[in-house]
């Protein structure tokens, strides 16, 4: 990866000059904001498995999913919000003001969380803490006998953890809150994939991970792990699977969506604000989605006409499903195609960005047990154990896995998408540490979607099939605004959402089934952040372009968006206003 020029470095220094002043607290209000940021980061380090893995901190306990823990966290947040309420905004510089905004929003979410406890299901593939728990075990470094003992000690916590998850599900059920029956068809196999004997359990340790242990110690360790799995870990997992698939399922609802549960409508409205980081209501988001879907549909029709296709949209979809060029012959080919698109965009980056992240990147296949519950995959930032940022792709069901939108997808995930956005912030040591380790969904996913669209301005969609793939991905992301709000706030049956998705999307029926459950039963509201965030970033770009006229430089705008880390959309607009004022002074 090439280094950026000295001139570009000087530009970055100018952009960062004022925010850097925030590194040294200047006033009592400055000190309060700095202390709150440090306390919040310490709070996150204590319990976040993701953060502990990323920072290379010891993993010595599994997550606490109880209401008591949420209430304790809320008390911590309330104390700091009280102190932050005494801060005088006029005493803060630009970067301190950003920190204050972020702390108030994120601590506010922690404070409010107990009010909605019991409305998230701990065994659905996206929301479940099992995903991070599995990764903690699978990436647990075992270089010596002390680490081996710590692994066994952590494994011994699994029965209590599984029991706590079951207790949460039982308490939910007592309130009339159960996982919908359709979602159980995914959740039960997901939990079942965690069970297994000493040879098949995902918590077993292959001998290759023990290369630095003395042979006798490795043998003893594997025997200990096998005994714990078969005696303590596997039985409660199998019991949970049997219960979910039997007694629990018998009373599970047919309907989907948060709106059916006590407190569900209020929780969903809160989630919409939380994930979009804007003061918008579900009905507003729904209408934005309807309007944008119509506009994208018109653009897709133009591309079909450009290709000389005279048939209908469903006929073109059927035509594409028969084009062998669009389907991989192996999981490895998926990775090769994705990285091929990355190699095409790399030479164009410097015309649009002042900096590149230092962290390397690549693609890998998802863990097979996670593939049934995930339509595509996810980006995993570098950690101490794995210093490369990887996009984990779904390598299953190859006959149904079209690569039509592979270019648009990987530009969203890696370059110039998540890998740029996450690592440019993490590598920028002028950003307060707590802000390098926290994100807002609308900013993170909004940037990913914006980056995918930006790739078109960088010349990546000259092939009409790549362009159609980009538009199909945009349709996929935008239709979420309609169906997520429809199922959770407007009382839509899942069948209505699925029918609309089948009419407008290129995805297979299997993918549509998975996605519709993700929106309605697993992580409602989260999918709204992608398009809402992207639309807001684009609006702010046009605001800056209009205000600056010929002085507008897209590289400097991108530096302003990315240079201070993840920001709520309302905070980002205030920061872009500050950026515009600074640019006018140049």
Please give the residue ranges for each predicted region.
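N-terminal maturation segment of proteins
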Residues: 17-586
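Bacterial N-terminal signal peptides that target proteins for export
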Residues: 1-11
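Hydrophobic membrane-insertion alpha-helices, especially the h-region
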Residues: 9-19
